[in-house]
Every structure is written in structure tokens, then in C-alpha cells.
């Protein structure tokens, strides 16, 4: 393995993270399209392992990677201030509402007999999705930027948050509660696992952005690739072994290890302490695999997928717009391979839809800039 020198302070993007995010985007689209077809029936011997692979890649290797990369990016963002993150919080809440509109409301408007009336799904407008989680994570990043010159205090605050989250999740990981009020239950679900209203509750998942943030800070101190890989492999294997042993001792489901969907989905969505530790192990080894892929392809694959990684926000929104519009058809699909073909179409549609949106946004920005310059010239 080449022992090349790193200059982290000059790095704007880490290719391994870009590659992981791009793979996570692809897996994310396929799992969301797959989930939109609840009546799929295996029709060949290879269907079952293929379904397992889709479910596995669409869980911790996707959501966990996005959240870890979120923390990584915050640590490498030298220009951002606490105000920057508060502004992003507002933007992400608005985007979360828009996404929930397309994910929940559009199917009900198109086919209320299948998906329920708009009134019945109304609380879903604030349903937990990764954008709501990301919005609340901005509060943590704002605090870290405010404490950037006080690393000991910042580390203590981070450790305290992780400790509190682990304790809360240890108590509530395998429990659910409901008040009977869908609006209130959905709101509570933004922060803690609540019946069927939570997917990425803040207390359950904030550990991943925190790990990403501090991993990036440690990375900045690295001097060569070999030391980074050795540390990542060691901690990843240790996390997996520890979580496996503890699960064997306490008899918890191995669905936590694989990240696959099971009857105990709560173990994944509520992110129990063991699940979080195991999730870190999976992502750490993914990082090593991404490094090996880059070495084998001379970074060509990372360059090819780099644009997809940069446009993750736009692609995420575009895929939910398309899935929302296609939901009445997807819910009737029973063949896995038809679902897969639709997934491929949604992936390409999301990618090029995001590209079109970015192009339009760029042209509008340029047009506004020209008008401002022209106004200044006339005034002068």
C-alpha cells in the first residue's frame, strides 16, 4: 500500500468519502423503489439473495454513510460559522416538508383508495426523514463551530451527547409508545423512536455525524495513507467483533448486524447502542474497500461518481418526486425485476433531473448577477 503523504489542510474533498456517498445514493434509490412495492414475490432462486443485498445496502451502508459524511464535511468546512448552520437548519426543514409532500401526499392525491385520503396522511408532512434529522444535526455543528477554539470542551460536549443518546436508546430501543394523537406522535418521532412514525429520530442517529466530525479531525492529523487504513481497519473490526459478542451474550437479533429489514425494524430505525457500534464497523470497513477500489481503478471510478456525490441533495429530492408520482403503479408491481428496471429508470431520472435543476439554478443566478451589474453601471 502506497505510503503517500497527506496534506489534509489543503484537501477540499476526500475521494473515498465521495465514492461511498455515490454508492450509497445508488443503493438508496433502489431500496426506496423496492419499499414502494410491498407485494413483490420471489420468482427465481436468485431473487431472495438479491433482495437481501438491496435491503442490506439500503440500510446502514446508505443512511449511516450520509450521516457520517455530514459530520466529515462540517469538520472540513473552515468558512462555516454557527449562523451558517442555523440557516441550513431552516433550509433543510423546508426541504423535508417538500419531500414528505411528494412522498406521502402525492400518492394519496393520485390514488386515495390505496394510500388513504390526504386528511389521513396529513401528519406525514412532518414525518421523520433524513432531511429533518439533518436539520437538527445542524445545531450540533453550530455548537462545534462555536467551540472550535476550545477542543477539550467540544470533545466533552460531544462525549456527553453520545452518552445520553446511548442511555436513552438502551432504554427505548425495543419499545414503542403512542398517545393516540398522530400529530403529536409524529412530532415526538422527530427526536426519539415512536411506534411507526420514526425513521431517523435525532437521539438515535446523531452519533454518526459526531463520529464523522471527530474522525475528520483525527484524519487532519494523519501523515500517510497507511496509518489511516490501519486505524480504520482496527477500529472497524473491533466494533464488529464487540457488537457480535454482545449480541450473542444478550441474544439480540442478528438483523442488527446485517442492517437488513426484519420483524425487528425498530432495532435499525431506533439505532440501539449495539446497532450504532456495529454500524460504525460496517462503514469503517466500507471506507477501506473504497480505498482499495480507488487504488485498483487509479481513482477513475471516484472521479466518475464524484458529481453524483456532490449533487446528493438534489438527487435525493428528485428521486422522491419520481417515486411519489410512480407510487400508484409501484404498489401494484409484484415482479422483482420489473421493480429493478423501474429503480434504474428512477436513478437515471433523478440524476439528470438534478443536473437540469442545477443548470436552471445556475442560469437564474447568472441572470440576476448580470441585472445587478447593469443596474450598478446605470447608477454610476
Question: Which residues fall in each region the model found?
Answer:
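Alpha-helical transmembrane segments and their immediate juxtamembrane cytosolic regions
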Residues: 1-380
Amino acid at each position: 500500500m502506497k505510503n503517500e503523504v497527506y496534506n489534509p489542510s489543503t484537501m477540499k474533498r476526500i475521494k473515498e468519502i465521495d465514492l461511498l456517498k455515490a454508492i450509497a445514493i445508488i443503493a438508496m434509490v433502489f431500496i426506496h423503489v423496492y419499499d414502494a412495492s410491498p407485494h413483490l414475490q420471489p420468482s427465481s432462486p436468485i431473487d431472495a439473495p438479491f433482495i437481501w443485498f438491496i435491503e442490506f445496502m439500503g440500510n446502514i451502508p446508505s443512511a449511516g454513510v450520509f450521516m457520517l459524511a455530514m459530520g466529515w464535511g462540517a469538520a472540513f468546512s473552515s468558512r462555516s460559522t454557527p449562523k451558517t448552520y442555523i440557516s441550513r437548519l431552516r433550509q433543510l426543514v423546508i426541504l423535508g416538508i417538500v419531500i414528505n409532500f411528494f412522498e406521502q401526499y402525492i400518492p394519496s392525491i393520485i390514488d386515495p383508495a390505496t394510500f388513504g385520503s390526504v386528511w389521513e396522511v396529513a401528519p406525514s408532512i412532518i414525518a421523520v426523514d433524513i432531511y429533518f434529522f439533518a436539520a437538527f444535526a445542524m445545531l450540533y455543528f453550530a455548537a462545534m463551530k462555536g467551540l472550535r477554539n476550545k477542543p477539550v470542551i467540544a470533545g466533552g460536549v460531544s462525549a456527553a451527547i453520545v452518552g445520553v443518546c446511548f442511555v436513552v436508546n438502551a432504554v427505548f430501543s425495543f419499545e414503542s409508545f403512542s398517545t393516540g394523537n398522530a400529530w403529536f406522535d409524529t412530532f415526538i418521532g422527530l427526536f426519539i423512536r415512536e411506534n411507526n412514525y420514526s425513521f431517523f429520530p435525532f437521539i438515535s442517529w446523531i452519533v454518526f455525524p459526531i463520529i464523522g466530525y471527530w474522525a475528520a479531525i483525527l484524519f487532519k492529523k494523519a501523515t500517510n495513507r497507511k496509518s489511516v487504513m490501519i486505524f480504520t481497519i482496527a477500529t472497524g473490526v473491533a466494533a464488529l467483533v464487540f457488537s457480535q459478542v454482545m449480541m450473542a451474550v444478550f441474544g439480540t437479533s442478528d438483523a442488527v448486524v446485517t442492517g437488513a429489514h426484519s420483524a425487528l425494524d425498530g432495532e435499525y430505525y431506533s439505532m440501539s447502542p449495539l446497532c450504532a457500534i456495529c454500524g460504525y464497523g460496517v462503514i469503517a470497513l466500507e471506507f477501506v474497500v473504497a480505498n482499495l477500489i480507488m487504488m485498483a481503478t487509479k481513482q477513475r471510478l471516484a472521479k466518475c461518481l464524484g458529481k453524483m456525490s456532490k449533487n446528493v441533495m438534489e438527487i435525493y429530492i428528485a428521486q422522491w418526486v419520481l417515486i411519489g408520482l410512480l407510487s400508484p403503479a409501484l404498489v401494484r408491481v409484484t415482479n422483482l425485476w420489473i421493480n429493478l428496471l423501474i429503480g434504474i429508470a428512477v436513478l437515471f431520472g433523478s440524476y439528470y433531473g438534478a443536473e437540469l435543476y442545477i443548470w436552471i439554478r445556475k442560469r437564474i443566478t447568472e441572470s440576476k448577477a448580470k441585472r445587478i451589474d447593469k443596474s450598478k453601471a446605470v447608477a454610476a
